[in-house]
């Protein structure tokens, strides 16, 4: 009787399984929907160049997503204390129709993480965020930026490219007249000028959630249209409860660069 070589059979089965894995595994385009947000690579990370937009959250909402702010009837604004604003949600940040390229706000930290994950991305850690925001890492940055230099603002040496309450660039937010007790609201993404590493609105416009826990909440970075430029600096450590959804808090997503 001929002796069966089980080792060869097992080895063949193993090779077949490996081949099947590589043929059938999903590519990034197959495994996650495509985001409309432009990206830039900084080190080993691929960053969304702008904050998450209403348009991309609409894509996530096709899964049946309804935000906590929607379920409660509206998100929050600060008016000497947090006040619920009926009808203010990620789709209608100031209670009226918004355009798809506005930053998505009124979303809590867990919702932000879920939206990033839907697009095959994640929220950045605080260390990742500050590195991308303040340390110029482009090989050949444009005039006004120097590779390896750490800047005081995400916009560079000054906050001039950013949108904030005062002392920043000459921008006006899209909030309807009389809707806010302070400031003019956010501007549409990519309508300011790029800053360190070619990123838009890392300083000002809206706060950005991170994945880093602190003081029982999660750190937010970059400040917003509600504050002056001093809150944009790296030394400003701010954390907020994970379940809070506010008119001036948004986020951006990041992905780990895949080496081919």
Model-derived segments and their meaning:
Residues 2-127, 134, 217, 237-260:
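Extended beta-strand/loop cores of jelly-roll/beta-sandwich
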């Amino acid at each position: 009787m001929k002796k069966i070589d089980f080792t060869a059979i097992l080895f063949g089965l193993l090779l077949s399984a490996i081949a099947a894995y590589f043929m059938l595994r999903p590519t990034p385009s197959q495994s996650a929907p495509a985001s409309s947000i432009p990206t830039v690579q900084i080190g080993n990370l691929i960053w969304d160049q702008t904050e998450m937009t209403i348009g991309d959250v609409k894509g996530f909402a096709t899964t049946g997503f309804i935000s906590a702010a929607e379920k409660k009837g509206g998100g929050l604004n600060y008016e000497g204390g947090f006040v619920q604003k009926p009808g203010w949600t990620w789709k209608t940040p100031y209670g009226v129709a918004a355009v798809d390229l506005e930053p998505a706000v009124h979303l809590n930290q867990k919702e932000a993480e879920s939206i990033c994950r839907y697009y095959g991305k994640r929220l950045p850690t605080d260390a990742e965020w500050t590195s991308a925001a303040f340390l110029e890492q482009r090989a050949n940055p444009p005039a006004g930026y120097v590779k390896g230099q750490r800047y005081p603002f995400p916009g560079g040496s000054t906050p001039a490219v950013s949108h904030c309450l005062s002392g920043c660039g000459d921008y006006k937010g899209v909030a309807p007249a009389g809707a806010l007790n302070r400031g003019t609201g956010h501007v549409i993404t990519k309508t300011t000028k790029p800053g360190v590493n070619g990123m838009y609105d890392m300083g000002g416009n809206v706060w950005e959630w991170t994945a880093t826990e602190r003081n029982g909440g999660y750190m937010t970075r970059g400040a917003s249209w509600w504050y002056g430029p001093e809150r944009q600096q790296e030394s400003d450590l701010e954390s907020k409860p994970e379940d809070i959804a506010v008119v001036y808090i948004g986020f951006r997503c990041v992905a780990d660069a895949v080496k081919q």
